[in-house]
Amino acid sequence: MKCPYCGSLDNKVIDSRLSRDDTETRRRRECLECARRFTTYEHVEKAPLMIVKKDGRREEFLKDKVRSGMMSACQKRRISINIIEDFISELEQDLMEMGEHEIPSSIIGEKVMKKLHALDDVAYVRFASVYREFKDVHDFYSELKSLLKKQ
């Protein structure tokens, strides 16, 4: 690793630690030329996940997009942002573990609906109304009716 101060390639690692989420290694290094210390971070380079939309378009998987949809559905509900953030991290990990570079958007939508269904029925119906493209009040009624049957 090149020293950011003098440009020397001679240095030694004096400390290594994993990040809180175990996705990065933080290394403290000391330059053997100028004796100054610096920090480097090492992480696995991930290939971007591509989402295949209903119309065949492909987009990069964006956690912010999932977060935005869930936050809209959960607005004014008693659902902690931490629960949403944890779910999004789990979702991304699940998608990575599938081993596919292209994933149908339907898989993500169904996983989000399943999670919201477990958390809060109102948030679930809100999300489902957008995801399933409810056209009128009858679509809401059908979804609510099936929810009530399950209770």
Swiss-Prot record:
Zinc finger (unnamed): 3-34
Family affiliation: Belongs to the NrdR family.
Chain segments annotated as transmembrane: none
Biological process according to GO: negative regulation of DNA-templated transcription
Name of the protein in its database record: Transcriptional repressor NrdR
UniProt KW keywords: ATP-binding, DNA-binding, Metal-binding, Nucleotide-binding, Repressor, Transcription, Transcription regulation, Zinc, Zinc-finger
InterPro entries associated with the record: ATP-cone_dom (IPR005144), NrdR-like_N (IPR055173), RNR_NrdR-like (IPR003796)
An example molecular function term from Gene Ontology annotations: DNA binding
Cofactor requirements of the protein: Zn(2+)
Matching Pfam families: ATP-cone, Zn_ribbon_NrdR
Record's cofactor remark: Binds 1 zinc ion.
Domain called ATP-cone: residue spans: 49-139
Species the sequence originates in: Desulfosudis oleivorans (strain DSM 6200 / JCM 39069 / Hxd3) (Desulfococcus oleovorans)
Described purpose of this protein according to its UniProt entry: Negatively regulates transcription of bacterial ribonucleotide reductase nrd genes and operons by binding to NrdR-boxes.
